[in-house]
Amino acid sequence: MKICTVCKNNKIEFFLNIKNLDYWQCELCKATMLNPIHYISSNKEKKHYLKHNNEIDDTRYRDFLTNLIEPLKDKICVNDIGLDYGCGYAPALADILKKDGFNIELYDPFFFKNENIFFRKFNFITCSEVVEHFFKPYEEFNKIDRLLAGKSWFAVMTLSLIHISEPTRHTRSR
């Protein structure tokens, strides 16, 4: 691996090995990334996601998603149009927002491959437990950026490397 997949910096170095998987870290942005030699096929990736227990009506999962939803709801309006990017096969986050009166579209490359979303703009985009799965994050973040309307929000929830059991929350105003 020679280039950071997040910021395209060429100063990355070996960071750690977990379960025989090599991870690299960028000196500039501090992103930690899996060495591409360990990437799995899209068929294996889809099978992996189908093993997730993220059922749409699971109360514990819905409670977990409020870590992303509640701060976002303070920033958006009911008339805003949102996108749940990487929603998975059971789009619980979108279901919660819809029940709260928000308009939200779905996109997932395996389960809701709605290519029409790439010709639209959204007032907010959510990514819950998604960005850590991007093989090409630089390209994905640019794709997402092109989908954001002016004065919009991109809400991300992912696991941190240090506190793997605690979700971290980041929102960015455009």
Regions found by a protein language model. Give the residues of each.
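Conserved N-terminal segment of class I S-adenosyl-L-methionine
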Residues: M1-F124, S128, Y138-F141
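Helix-to-beta-strand junctions that scaffold the AdoMet/dcAdoMet cofactor pocket
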Residues: F134-F135, L148-G150
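Alpha-helical hinge/cap motifs
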Residues: C29, H133, E166-T168
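Class I S-adenosylmethionine-dependent transferase superfamily signal
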Residues: I144
